[in-house]
Amino acid sequence: MAGIVHGILFCGLFGLCWAVTGSRIYPASEVTLLDSRSVQGELGWIASPLEGGWEEVSIMDEKNTPIRTYQVCNVMESSQNNWLRTDWIPRSGAQRVYVEIKFTLRDCNSLPGVMGTCKETFNLYYYESNNDKERFIRETQYVKIDTIAADESFTQVDIGDRIMKLNTEVRDVGPLSKKGFYLAFQDVGACIALVSVRVFYKKCPLTVRNLAQFPDTITGSDTSSLVEVRGSCVDNSEEKDVPKMYCGADGEWLVPIGNCLCNAGFEEHNGGCQACKVGYYKALSTDAACSKCPPHSYALREGSTSCTCDRGYFRADTDPASMPCTRPPSAPQNLISNVNETSVNLEWSPPQNSGGRPDVSYNLVCKRCGSDLTRCSPCGSGVHYSPQQNGLKTTKVSINDLQAHTNYTFEVWAINGVSKQNPEQDQAVSVTVTTNQAAPSTVTQIQPKEITRHSVSLTWPEPERANGVILEYEVKYYEKDQNERSYRIVKTASRSADIKGLNPLTGYVFHVRARTAAGYGEFSGPFEFTTNTVPSPMIGEGTSPTVLLVSVAGSIVLVVILIAAFVISRRRSKYSKAKQEADEEKHLNQGVKTYVDPFTYEDPNQAVREFAKEIDASCIKIEKVIGVGEFGEVCSGRLKVPGKREIYVAIKTLKAGYTDKQRRDFLSEASIMGQFDHPNIIHLEGVVTKCKPVMIITEYMENGSLDAFLRKNDGRFTVIQLVGMLRGIGSGMKYLSDMSYVHRDLAARNILVNSNLVCKVSDFGMSRVLEDDPEAAYTTRGGKIPIRWTAPEAIAYRKFTSASDVWSYGIVMWEVMSYGERPYWDMSNQDVIKAIEEGYRLPPPMDCPIALHQLMLDCWQKDRSDRPKFGQIVSMLDKLIRNPNSLKRTGLENSRTNTALLDPSSPEWSQVASVLDWLQASKWKRYKDNFTAAGYTSLEAVVHVNQDDLTRIGISSPSHQNKILSSVQGMRTQLQQMQGRMVPV
């Protein structure tokens, strides 16, 4: 019976092979390690037992090529254990391999008398080994891969109809670690024929993506792993971003990242980089493709990165490679002169040929010549040009302060961006003129010869340029306090004058000007002198001892009076305060820079030109929008000014469709910022006004606004770090105060923080009008600003001073120490105003040092003259930083007993009837037993509790102690108010 079965299986196998064998093409992602059909001659695999088990059979395919197969069909006997082992298979670096088995299997039901012994499955095993010296099959060494079952089995009918049912099964094996392995097939009683066995591993084949080549890569050790592979740029290309891809377990490349770019002089073609053709160029690797040489240039070789200019044509250093080559301009045309005494006006027409460039400008050369017009020399610095001498964009200029009756030659040169590269070309036109008689120049000095009680005798030198015969001098004088509203004139033919009829001990301002036949010159600058108090000449040589003694005695008395007044004023406040009236008088010390309000300029654009640097828009690269401001978008980007390194900047843009007023208001902030130069004031890089959009360029602050930054980093900084931030803000505000600038909107949201935690004051563009609505804030063009940062006198009377900025600084201190908490929490603006008016102030934030909260309270003094100056604030913060121990003491106690503290966690006294009510309202019910056990059964006892008491009754958490004590303080304050014992500040 067994022989019959073997014969049936063999005949069926022969017919099958004729249909399925032949040359096969495998996917590129599969690398074959073993293919039984490609072996020439016998396979020679080891079988166990050697006889009566697996049998090697050779059959012919349709091309009469022998194919070696193995078959077994011991279905008549039970307990079969027939093993077949392949030769040693090297794994070739693969960590996971795949076994493809093609086989046929006889249906047990089609064989009579084998129901108890016939099987329809077989087992697949593997064994790893570093060599091929295994001669025997040691079953215990092998690891089972799987039990293989047929999807289809054949019967006797199929054999008769020559229908053979071939099964294909694939199993993966791994991870593998040794040099190679064996496969083994275990038959347990099936009628089976192994038609072919193929072992392979998968790889991601060599490929080129985004100009990067990725090599053949073997897949990972498991079916879900991804192998990261770094690509290498193809020839003549460079990395833009590191090229990477992932090799999937199925041999497919996934997720391409990064790319390469063809080098300058090369462009992409069919997955590679080819050189630019003759007549074409590519300047940068980031350019997409080669471009044809621009006009007046050529490229004679392949792979050019730029084109050479034709003879006589040039390219400026700042010109892009895509710009046509250009020439210097021809000379200006039609130069016309107009002489007006010692001034000359010149006008001309543009050059006939601009050289092909739009950047034509004009330089003016002035020469003073002798009578024969042969000996000429430069005019010197005394001559003035309007609008300027060099870099003129207009075709007219005025030359002033020339000498009278003098010959001058003026040359007008036309230049453009390539003029320096061809200095030999004549680009100028000239004209010679003779000036007329002119008025004299300004008197530069006035000196007092004698000063008495009612008169001043003056003398002065002749003007530097008389420009003719001086006919007379005119002296204008007035009292200092009159500011030229009422003045008198005295005329004299000499260089001196006696001014009489003056008031004693009064300051007078004097101006002098000279007159010739051509008219009056300009008045001199102001010179101030004060009359005496006693009828005597100036103290000097020849003064009597008596007069000298009286003068000295009077001076001593005056000094004593001033010292006494100073001491009295010092006693009024520990901060050396002086009563600040509604209109504060600004004392401008010599050498101290003072803020100039740009809105006082008749032409606001003049303020922008004076205080802000104009930047070429081509130097700016906008990268992304980071916010929306009052006038348009706020962006981040880069600024690269020629000759300087590239820096990150913030860019404010003016939205399209703006009005003249909006443009003026937008640029006013730049006019203000441009006057400031301090490490704690936001730095203005410049403006763009000559093209759209109009932009303000400032330094870039990486960490954004201080309030948001603190909220994002709640609790991460030490007290010293927070005080350092406050010190920086205070230093910036001291600088502004010293310049007589009042900020008006100092708040944490208007402080910017850079990557080094340096805080800088910003937002100088606000104009505010206080509305009558108590719930309103200062109305601006972009919205409303909450009044909870604003001093009470500024709210009530619009009194904005440095002292009101100090109040705002105190609120900023509170914001910093509370990590960006909203001042006064969710109270309405009307309630805030009312509470402040009644003497209430913000309590110390959690863990805030007492010294810092005391400084806050000093900043919040109702009388603005009692508040510290910014210089004193900075000095105090410096002392705290130098003495860190002074910052360790925290608590809720307060030396100002008449200042009630606000606390949102304190329940209303009227709503609390017992200790339990208070604990529930304050969310501290967990400590009910602690208070009860310690004997705190009434609210009258609770309001006297302190930190030691809380520790004693078992409440040890510092944060819980602070919050409970804060609530107790609020309860105590409300109780005092109800009993009439508290007097608001």
UniProtKB/Swiss-Prot annotation:
<dbReference type="GO" id="GO:0005005">
    <property type="term" value="F:transmembrane-ephrin receptor activity"/>
</dbReference>
<keyword id="KW-0217">Developmental protein</keyword>
<keyword id="KW-0967">Endosome</keyword>
<dbReference type="GO" id="GO:0031901">
    <property type="term" value="C:early endosome membrane"/>
</dbReference>
<dbReference type="InterPro" id="IPR013783">
    <property type="entry name" value="Ig-like_fold"/>
</dbReference>
<dbReference type="InterPro" id="IPR001090">
    <property type="entry name" value="Ephrin_rcpt_lig-bd_dom"/>
</dbReference>
<dbReference type="InterPro" id="IPR001660">
    <property type="entry name" value="SAM"/>
</dbReference>
<protein>
    <recommendedName>
        <fullName>Ephrin type-A receptor 4-B</fullName>
        <ecNumber>2.7.10.1</ecNumber>
    </recommendedName>
</protein>
<feature type="short sequence motif" description="PDZ-binding">
    <location>
        <begin position="983"/>
        <end position="985"/>
    </location>
</feature>
<dbReference type="InterPro" id="IPR008979">
    <property type="entry name" value="Galactose-bd-like_sf"/>
</dbReference>
<keyword id="KW-0829">Tyrosine-protein kinase</keyword>
<dbReference type="GO" id="GO:0048013">
    <property type="term" value="P:ephrin receptor signaling pathway"/>
</dbReference>
<dbReference type="InterPro" id="IPR030602">
    <property type="entry name" value="EphA4_SAM"/>
</dbReference>
<feature type="modified residue" description="Phosphotyrosine; by autocatalysis">
    <location>
        <position position="601"/>
    </location>
</feature>
<feature type="signal peptide">
    <location>
        <begin position="1"/>
        <end position="20"/>
    </location>
</feature>
<dbReference type="GO" id="GO:0007411">
    <property type="term" value="P:axon guidance"/>
</dbReference>
<keyword id="KW-0677">Repeat</keyword>
<dbReference type="InterPro" id="IPR013761">
    <property type="entry name" value="SAM/pointed_sf"/>
</dbReference>
<dbReference type="GO" id="GO:0005524">
    <property type="term" value="F:ATP binding"/>
</dbReference>
<feature type="glycosylation site" description="N-linked (GlcNAc...) asparagine">
    <location>
        <position position="407"/>
    </location>
</feature>
<dbReference type="GO" id="GO:0005886">
    <property type="term" value="C:plasma membrane"/>
</dbReference>
<dbReference type="Pfam" id="PF00041">
    <property type="entry name" value="fn3"/>
</dbReference>
<keyword id="KW-0732">Signal</keyword>
<dbReference type="InterPro" id="IPR001245">
    <property type="entry name" value="Ser-Thr/Tyr_kinase_cat_dom"/>
</dbReference>
<feature type="modified residue" description="Phosphotyrosine; by autocatalysis">
    <location>
        <position position="595"/>
    </location>
</feature>
<dbReference type="InterPro" id="IPR011009">
    <property type="entry name" value="Kinase-like_dom_sf"/>
</dbReference>
<dbReference type="GO" id="GO:0030425">
    <property type="term" value="C:dendrite"/>
</dbReference>
<dbReference type="InterPro" id="IPR017441">
    <property type="entry name" value="Protein_kinase_ATP_BS"/>
</dbReference>
<feature type="glycosylation site" description="N-linked (GlcNAc...) asparagine">
    <location>
        <position position="340"/>
    </location>
</feature>
<keyword id="KW-0812">Transmembrane</keyword>
<dbReference type="GO" id="GO:0043087">
    <property type="term" value="P:regulation of GTPase activity"/>
</dbReference>
<keyword id="KW-0675">Receptor</keyword>
<dbReference type="Pfam" id="PF07714">
    <property type="entry name" value="PK_Tyr_Ser-Thr"/>
</dbReference>
<keyword id="KW-0547">Nucleotide-binding</keyword>
<feature type="domain" description="Fibronectin type-III 1">
    <location>
        <begin position="328"/>
        <end position="438"/>
    </location>
</feature>
<dbReference type="InterPro" id="IPR009030">
    <property type="entry name" value="Growth_fac_rcpt_cys_sf"/>
</dbReference>
<keyword id="KW-0524">Neurogenesis</keyword>
<dbReference type="GO" id="GO:0007155">
    <property type="term" value="P:cell adhesion"/>
</dbReference>
<dbReference type="InterPro" id="IPR008266">
    <property type="entry name" value="Tyr_kinase_AS"/>
</dbReference>
<keyword id="KW-0472">Membrane</keyword>
<dbReference type="Pfam" id="PF01404">
    <property type="entry name" value="Ephrin_lbd"/>
</dbReference>
<feature type="topological domain" description="Extracellular">
    <location>
        <begin position="21"/>
        <end position="547"/>
    </location>
</feature>
